[in-house]
């Protein structure tokens, strides 16, 4: 990098925009000396951190930089024992410690901004220093009265003494003989002594010491003799106060020295946060983004804007160097924006390599160039003197001596300022040299010979700045792939110059130049046609995308409606099945009560089968709406199961896999039910417990059903009573607990219909009370 390139690309002017946001004076020098990074890893780390800070500023309130100071320079002042900081300096240290601590806490709470959290995560906690300073200094940056016991006593004495002095003056003011002596009845101070303004002509009336006179000489400031001793005492107290404050400041200085290393770490973080904040404010205000910077030798800018042109008026530039070609040659007349395009490329590259976001799309890519070299002349001058051409040659010579494959070269109006033929030849020779070195270059020229040369050479792409011949003004659009036209005669014709002059001028143009201009015109026409095709294609793509979006939305609506229908169908089916289960349960209960009436039993069996068939039909209707999931069979013939539709236990008689149903028997009832109405029941071993210290006798036994569901409890009770009857028990205890009473009600309902039960009663005293039912067996 060289200073000349920085100057012509106005990098220092860009830094001034960032300096406007700097708070700490020391950092102004840091920004002024800012230049491209030497290490790619360090640069990318900086860009990531700046990106985090930009997002923090945009979405989470940013960072409060007001009050930040270079506290490291303050620490230098107290290196030696016996030195201390003034009150305001201590307050500045306190503000910085608190700012960083609160900022770290905020980042931890947000839980994002990884780069920022890693940067600030290792700072030490110096809350103890904050507390000491806060207890010593108030927000008005004054030492508090209670900073020490001695200081409190001194200030209390001063307050009392001050009241006495005021009282003495008031007595003087009230003296009738002195009513005309005072210029004003006020107390003021001169040389640290309390005095009052007295008219010059009456000064002899008041005995005291004259300390000062007004500029007119009409007023003298006198310390009355009655106040002198009090003033002397006040001076003594003030001296003691200053000494006590000095001791307090020395103690705090010692505390700071003991924590010097930690304070210096925080000081460095504070200064870095100030720089990050300044860069980020500039970036957010100017709609800047972080480009990709890599070792690839490429310069690809998308929607790039020059930082010094109004962001709402500038025409963005898009181009790429380093992929299909190494040199971009912009041709065409002056005033078309060629130099602005060249400066945009150079300045944005310097910004990115220096860790500054650029006014361009985040899709932009910039190579980690070893050097950025620029030679930019005054493109608007009508004549260039030999001296300016010599300076131009000197700059080009220095650039060619320094460039490598990994350099970016920016040359404005190469070869201008001398004979056009020699200037064009010189320009082509320089371009050849840069092309051989594979050096990434951005070059502007208005020579026709160079246009034709660039169009035909390998590794070079021509471009031009669009010019509106109707309005006779540039549009500042960069047209890559299209060489620039001079437009001089076209402009002259539109401005009304005689046609004879225009025709004669065309005759003077050489055939070669005419061919070049014709070639450019054809290329421009084809390019415009291609642009129109691209626009049509883009419109069609957008229409197709919108159609896809509409179709997607319609599909979502249909899917939602379908789900609502399915939900409604399920709810209706569930309602009907619950009704059928209730009817089935009632039929079963009726069968058990009227078991002896065979005709009624047959009719009930028939009704139950009809209900079972209806239940299956309802299930099938629901399946038509939603594809049925095949039920997994986990039972076999002979298994004991619970049938949900009739709310009863039964045994499997037959399994019909194709129909996904099974024939079951519950008591004398036989019916076919779907698989999903069947629940396998595993037999459990009985547990035997004592109830409320009830003594077990040879003829008594218990079953504990507490904590079980009603269905499960009834099944276990039924099995238990079978065994109890076989074992000859005449009385058993069924423990169900008190609870909500639901389990007890279910068990009593079962006992009422059970064929083994003769009678039952609630447990008595010592038998469990309401928590136990005593059952007498037949």
Swiss-Prot record:
InterPro entries: DNA_mismatch_repair_MutS_C (IPR000432), DNA_mismatch_repair_MutS_core (IPR007696), DNA_mismatch_repair_MutS_sf (IPR036187), MSSS (IPR046893), MutS (IPR045076), MutS2 (IPR005747), P-loop_NTPase (IPR027417), Smr_dom (IPR002625). One of its GO terms (molecular function) is endonuclease activity. ATP binds at residues 332-339. It is an enzyme of class 3 (hydrolase). Keywords: ATP-binding, DNA-binding, Endonuclease, Hydrolase, Nuclease, Nucleotide-binding, RNA-binding, rRNA-binding. Its EC number is 3.1.-.-, 3.6.4.-. Residues 703-778 form the Smr domain. GO terms for biological process: mismatch repair; negative regulation of DNA recombination; rescue of stalled ribosome. Homodimer. Binds to stalled ribosomes, contacting rRNA. Belongs to the DNA mismatch repair MutS family. MutS2 subfamily. Endonuclease that is involved in the suppression of homologous recombination and thus may have a key role in the control of bacterial genetic diversity. Acts as a ribosome collision sensor, splitting the ribosome into its 2 subunits. Detects stalled/collided 70S ribosomes which it binds and splits by an ATP-hydrolysis driven conformational change. Acts upstream of the ribosome quality control system (RQC), a ribosome-associated complex that mediates the extraction of incompletely synthesized nascent chains from stalled ribosomes and their subsequent degradation. Probably generates substrates for RQC. This is Endonuclease MutS2. It comes from Fusobacterium nucleatum subsp. nucleatum (strain ATCC 25586 / DSM 15643 / BCRC 10681 / CIP 101130 / JCM 8532 / KCTC 2640 / LMG 13131 / VPI 4355).
């Amino acid at each position: 990098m060289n200073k000349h390139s920085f100057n012509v690309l106005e990098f220092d002017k860009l830094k001034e925009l960032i300096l406007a946001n700097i708070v700490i004076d020391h950092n102004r020098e840091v920004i002024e000396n800012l230049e491209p990074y030497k290490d790619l890893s360090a640069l990318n780390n900086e860009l990531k951190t700046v990106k985090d800070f930009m997002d923090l500023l945009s979405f989470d309130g940013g960072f409060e930089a007001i009050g930040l100071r270079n506290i490291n320079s303050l620490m230098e002042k107290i290196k030696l024992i016996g030195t201390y900081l003034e009150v305001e300096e201590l307050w500045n240290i306190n503000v910085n410690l608190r700012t960083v601590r609160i900022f770290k806490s905020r980042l931890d709470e947000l839980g994002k901004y990884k780069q920022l959290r890693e940067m600030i995560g290792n700072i030490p906690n110096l809350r103890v220093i904050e507390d000491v300073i806060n207890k010593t200094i108030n927000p008005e940056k004054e030492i508090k009265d209670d900073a020490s016991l001695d200081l409190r006593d001194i200030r209390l004495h001063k307050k009392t003494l001050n009241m006495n002095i005021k009282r003495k003056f008031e007595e003087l003011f009230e003296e009738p003989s002195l009513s005309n002596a005072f210029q004003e009845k006020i107390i003021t101070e001169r040389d640290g002594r309390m005095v009052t303004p007295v008219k010059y002509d009456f000064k002899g009336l008041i005995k005291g010491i004259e300390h000062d006179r007004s500029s007119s000489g009409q007023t003298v400031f006198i310390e009355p003799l009655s106040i002198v001793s009090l003033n002397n005492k006040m001076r003594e107290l003030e001296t003691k106060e200053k000494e006590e404050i000095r001791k307090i400041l020395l103690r705090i200085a010692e505390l700071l020295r003991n924590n010097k290393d930690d304070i210096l770490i925080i000081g460095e973080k504070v200064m870095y946060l100030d720089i990050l904040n300044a860069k980020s404010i500039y970036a957010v205000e100017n709609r800047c983004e972080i480009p990709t910077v890599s070792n690839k030798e490429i310069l690809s800018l998308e929607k790039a804007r020059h930082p010094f042109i109004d962001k709402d008026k500038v025409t963005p530039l898009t181009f790429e160097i380093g992929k299909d070609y190494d040199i971009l040659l912009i041709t065409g007349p002056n005033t078309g924006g060629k130099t602005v395009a060249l400066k945009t490329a150079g300045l944005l590259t310097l910004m990115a390599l220096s860790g500054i976001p650029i006014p361009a799309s985040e899709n932009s890519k910039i190579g980690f160039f070893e050097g950025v070299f620029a030679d930019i002349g005054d493109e608007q001058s009508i004549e260039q003197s030999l001296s300016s051409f010599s300076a131009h040659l000197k700059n080009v010579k220095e650039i060619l001596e320094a460039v490598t494959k990994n350099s970016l070269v920016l040359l404005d109006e190469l070869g201008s300022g001398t004979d056009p033929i020699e200037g064009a030849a010189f320009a082509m020779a320089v371009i050849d040299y840069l092309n051989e070195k594979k050096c990434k270059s951005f070059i502007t020229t208005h020579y026709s010979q160079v246009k034709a040369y660039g169009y035909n050479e390998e590794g070079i792409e021509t471009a031009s700045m669009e010019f509106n011949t109707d309005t006779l003004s540039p549009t500042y659009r960069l047209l890559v792939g299209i060489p620039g036209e001079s437009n001089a005669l076209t402009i002259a014709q539109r401005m009304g110059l005689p046609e004879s002059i225009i025709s004669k001028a065309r005759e003077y143009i050489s055939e070669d130049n005419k061919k070049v201009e014709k070639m450019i015109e054809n290329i421009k026409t084809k390019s415009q046609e291609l642009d129109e095709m691209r626009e049509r294609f883009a419109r069609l793509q957008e229409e197709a995308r919108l159609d896809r979006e509409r179709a997607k939305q319609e599909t979502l609506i249909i899917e939602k409606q379908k789900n609502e229908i399915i939900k409604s169908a399920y709810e209706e089916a569930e309602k009907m099945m619950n009704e059928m289960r209730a009817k089935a349960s009632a039929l079963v209960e009726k069968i058990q009560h009227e078991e002896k009436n065979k005709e009624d039993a047959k009719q009930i069996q028939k009704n139950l089968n009809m209900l079972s068939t209806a239940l299956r039909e309802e299930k099938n209707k629901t399946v038509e709406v939603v594809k049925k999931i095949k039920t997994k069979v986990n039972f076999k013939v002979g298994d004991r199961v619970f049938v949900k539709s009739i709310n009863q236990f039964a045994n499997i008689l037959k399994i019909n896999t194709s129909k996904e149903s099974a024939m079951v028997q519950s008591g004398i009832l036989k019916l076919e039910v779907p698989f999903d109405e069947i629940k396998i029941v595993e037999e459990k071993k009985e547990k035997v417990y004592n109830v409320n210290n009830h003594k077990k006798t040879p003829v008594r036994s218990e079953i504990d059903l507490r904590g079980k569901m009603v269905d499960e409890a009834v099944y276990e009770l039924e099995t238990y009573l079978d065994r109890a009857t076989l074992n000859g028990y005449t009385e058993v205890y069924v423990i169900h607990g008190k609870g909500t009473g639901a389990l007890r009600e279910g068990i009593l309902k079962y006992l009422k219909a059970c064929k083994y039960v003769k009678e039952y009663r609630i447990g008595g005293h010592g038998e469990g009370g309401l928590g136990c039912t005593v059952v007498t067996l037949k």
